């Protein structure tokens, strides 16, 4: 069975060549992640039809957008995409409402799946509709830009580093709106970023690019745990886990989060949440230590029985990265080579992971 989204590109530049062969899910958020110059934006622009690759095949759901072998190239305006750039280019002489309505005009009424009231409510911009763009903050402008893209009733959303031009405060304001779009709209999104914290919070599927090549493509919880990828060697190495809130301790303000497909759970300091709520958390490799026996004489809340899957030298040869299995959930631990030798770590070994900190992402 073919994947809902297929992207095969080859295009040569003086300094590198872009080569992608991707089969992507037709729902959720797929992040294209990598350093500057890795080919993320080029890939997005080719999907949008804004750049032509030397060789290409792009299919979204059941529609072929381009195929160089068959001479197919669908014009950008026919591709049913919503494109969000780093900075929203709004018409300065029009109000927010008029900017949004302008973007809707080319969509026949019978094809409009999203209406202005729904888009403005989803992005929290009802109170901004009468303002002009020069009266908006950077975060407000970008929310208007996202709403404008939604009003084209797209089959695919393309977001090219939409938070890159914003400061930390403005980013934190927009992220919940992107999460809401993810939850409430059945529109796949391709999200370009080089910010690992954004990707960890938003993405379901991760494509890792470097120098125009695809290093990896897969579910984010699996891809972040791969020791053969550069992400595992960085200081922010860690895993993303989507668990379920199973209990709340009102006195200590601790959530109990059950890990997916497992009877194992972790306790997380957080405000009360409804039992059954899905919660995305991140565990950094540097916050995981290993022990042959569970140590209950410490302040560490979370101790999980784990099995060693593999280990690899970290970027600093004094350390190793250890991949662990916690009841089907992957974990990473960054420990010294000395500690590895002292524990006599080996594949299949059973021991205990002690987790010093857990970050709630969403």
Swiss-Prot record:
Keyword Chaperone: no
Gene Ontology MF annotations: ABC-type molybdate transporter activity; ATP binding; ATP hydrolysis activity
Cross-referenced InterPro entries: AAA+_ATPase, ABC_transporter-like_ATP-bd, ABC_transporter-like_CS, Mo/tungstate-bd_C_term_dom, ModC_ABC_ATP-bd, Molybdenum_import_ModC, Mop_domain, P-loop_NTPase
Alphabetical UniProt keywords: ATP-binding, Cell inner membrane, Cell membrane, Membrane, Molybdenum, Nucleotide-binding, Translocase, Transport
Membrane-protein topology: Peripheral membrane protein
SUPFAM superfamilies associated with the record: MOP-like, P-loop containing nucleoside triphosphate hydrolases
Pfam families per the UniProt record, alphabetical: ABC_tran (PF00005), TOBE (PF03459)
ABC transporter domain location: 2-236
EC number: 7.3.2.5
Cell location: Cell inner membrane
Annotated ranges, domain Mop: 297-362
Chemical reaction(s) catalysed: molybdate(out) + ATP + H2O = molybdate(in) + ADP + phosphate + H(+)
GO CC annotation: plasma membrane
The protein's assembly and partners: The complex is composed of two ATP-binding proteins (ModC), two transmembrane proteins (ModB) and a solute-binding protein (ModA).
Family assignment from sequence similarity: Belongs to the ABC transporter superfamily. Molybdate importer (TC 3.A.1.8) family.
Function field: Part of the ABC transporter complex ModABC involved in molybdenum import. Responsible for energy coupling to the transport system.
Listed name of the protein: Molybdenum import ATP-binding protein ModC
